[in-house]
Amino acid sequence: MAKGQSLQDPFLNALRRERVPVSIYLVNGIKLQGQVESFDQFVILLKNTVSQMVYKHAISTVVPARPFNVTGHQNAQGGYGPQDDVPSGE
């Protein structure tokens, strides 16, 4: 799995687990809204009144509608949440 997905997967999984409403902005400017139902390496299944399969390569930004907890879990690729950052020497 690509190194760039070490934060992406826990982020999307937390959105899915906590059923956080999201706005997904596509590269062409279209805004989609709903909840992340599932996802894989290439697509996100977004559920609102209908389910939409959104290809990740078409996504610009994912904006959660409310705060949620994505921190505190090391994933299989070794990624960490912000509270696990290496101290800056202070």
UniProtKB/Swiss-Prot annotation:
CDD domains: Hfq (cd01716)
PANTHER family tied to this protein: RNA-BINDING PROTEIN HFQ
Family: Belongs to the Hfq family.
Coiled coil: none
Protein name: RNA-binding protein Hfq
GO biological process: regulation of DNA-templated transcription; regulation of RNA stability; regulation of translation, ncRNA-mediated
Residues in Sm domain copies: 9-68
Encoding gene, per UniProt annotation: hfq
Disordered, as annotated region: 71-90
One term under GO cellular component: cytosol
Keywords: RNA-binding, Stress response
Known function: RNA chaperone that binds small regulatory RNA (sRNAs) and mRNAs to facilitate mRNA translational regulation in response to envelope stress, environmental stress and changes in metabolite concentrations. Also binds with high specificity to tRNAs.
Keyword RNA-binding: yes
Subunit structure: Homohexamer.
Protein's UniProt keywords contain Nucleotide-binding: no
Alphabetized GO MF terms: RNA binding
